[in-house]
UniProtKB/Swiss-Prot annotation:
UniProt binding sites for NADP(+): 11-22, 45, 162-163, 211, 213, 215-216, 263-266, 269, 272-273
Modified residues (N6-succinyllysine): 127, 145
One term of GO molecular function: allyl-alcohol dehydrogenase activity
Positions carrying N6-acetyllysine: 127
Gene Ontology biological process terms in this record: aldehyde catabolic process; cellular detoxification of aldehyde; D-glucuronate catabolic process; L-ascorbic acid biosynthetic process; lipid metabolic process
Disulfide bonds: none
Enzyme Commission numbers on file: 1.1.1.2, 1.1.1.372, 1.1.1.54, 1.1.1.19
Signal peptide feature range: none
Localisation: Cytoplasm, Cytosol; Apical cell membrane
Oligomeric form and interacting partners: Monomer.
GO cellular component, as recorded: apical plasma membrane; cytosol
Protein name, entry field: Aldo-keto reductase family 1 member A1
Catalytic reaction equation(s): a primary alcohol + NADP(+) = an aldehyde + NADPH + H(+); glycerol + NADP(+) = D-glyceraldehyde + NADPH + H(+); glycerol + NADP(+) = L-glyceraldehyde + NADPH + H(+); L-gulonate + NADP(+) = aldehydo-D-glucuronate + NADPH + H(+)
Length: 325
């Protein structure tokens, strides 16, 4: 079953369900990609920092292109610029490394992964002696200008942002000659992001939800935190529609035209996650799921300082999550 699409302002069609690859182990991700492509996925979400683009490239090389199972023009591939590569001189080399690893001539979408820059170099998490991150003063508006040059060169079809606040999006729009097409953020019924989605849609950006199932596999999970997949309303709808709780959460998103990139390396789940286009919730059922919102953000980069877990970047002037949305 192919996923339905949204139309980006660039004219590109972006499938509403893609395969996420964050936390997909090398050794597993190649088979996951190949399986996903055989069951109808046409959207793969990648990032340099995930450390698995080389293996994803092997899967794409075997499956995508002239005379192979999937024509390149049918596939939508996203990747992301890491924080150590924000300096304008580093942007194109970073993209070219991603393209080489993925064995692609162009990306359909390239996102700035976070608004703030880390110190330049090959260490992805440069640190001070006390364990805090070493930042770089490059502003995302300057990085954006360097990203725009990649579109002019035909290396990237569309640009976007990840983990930016509404204010930061407007800041980019104020200098952009190539407008961002997509914002990727954490989003699920506990963090519905209604204001941010409305903000984006009013400005011609589509929204992609990462961790759409609540990321229960994250390393720092607090055992006392609520579990989205176990919510009674989710369970009740799963029973009513004879679906899994995951399918209920994904259907809620695609029904509000939010793109989802659930990660899995398990074939049965990969298949299940795309089977969300043959049932529809009533407006009342959508409201029941909307009511789960508690602005609960799970994905906040953390550090251990003096034995305590603290948000790694919260003191940075460009930290996005200090803004209301």
């Amino acid at each position: 079953m192919a996923a339905s699409c949204v139309l980006l302002h660039t004219g590109q069609k972006m499938p509403l369900i893609g395969l996420g690859t964050w936390k997909s182990e090398p050794g597993q991700v190649k088979a996951a990609i190949k399986y996903a492509l055989t069951v109808g996925y046409r959207h793969i979400d990648c990032a340099a920092i995930y450390g698995n683009e080389l293996e994803i490239g092997e899967a794409l090389q075997e499956t995508v292109g002239p005379g192979k199972a999937v024509p390149r023009e049918e596939l939508f591939v996203t990747s992301k610029l890491w924080n150590t590569k924000h300096h304008p001189e580093d942007v194109e080399p970073a993209l070219r490394k991603t393209l080489a690893d993925l064995q692609l001539e162009y990306l359909d979408l390239y996102l700035m992964h976070w608004p703030y820059a880390f110190e330049r170099g090959d260490n992805p998490f440069p640190k001070n002696a006390d364990g805090t991150i070493r930042y770089d003063a490059t502003h995302y508006k300057d990085t954006w200008k360097a990203l725009e040059a990649l579109v002019a060169k035909g290396l990237v079809r569309a640009l976007g942002l990840s983990n930016f606040s509404s204010r930061q999006i407007d800041d980019v729009l104020s200098v952009a000659s190539v407008r961002p097409a997509v914002l990727q953020v954490e989003c699920h019924p506990y963090l519905a992001q209604n204001e941010l989605i409305a903000h984006c849609q009013a400005r011609g950006l589509e929204v992609t939800a990462y961790s759409p199932l609540g990321s229960s596999d994250r390393a720092w999970r607090d055992p006392n935190e609520p579990v989205l997949l176990e919510e009674p309303v989710v369970q009740a709808l799963a029973e009513k529609y004879n679906r899994s709780p995951a399918q209920i959460l994904l259907r809620w998103q695609v029904q509000r035209k939010v793109i989802c990139i659930p990660k899995s390396v398990t074939p049965s789940r990969i298949l299940q996650n795309i089977q969300v286009f043959d049932f529809t919730f009533s407006p009342e059922e959508m409201k029941q799921l909307d009511a789960l919102n508690k602005n609960l953000r799970f994905i906040v980069p953390m550090l251990t300082v003096d034995g305590k877990r603290v948000p790694r970047d919260a003191g940075h002037p460009l930290y996005p999550f200090n803004d209301p949305y």
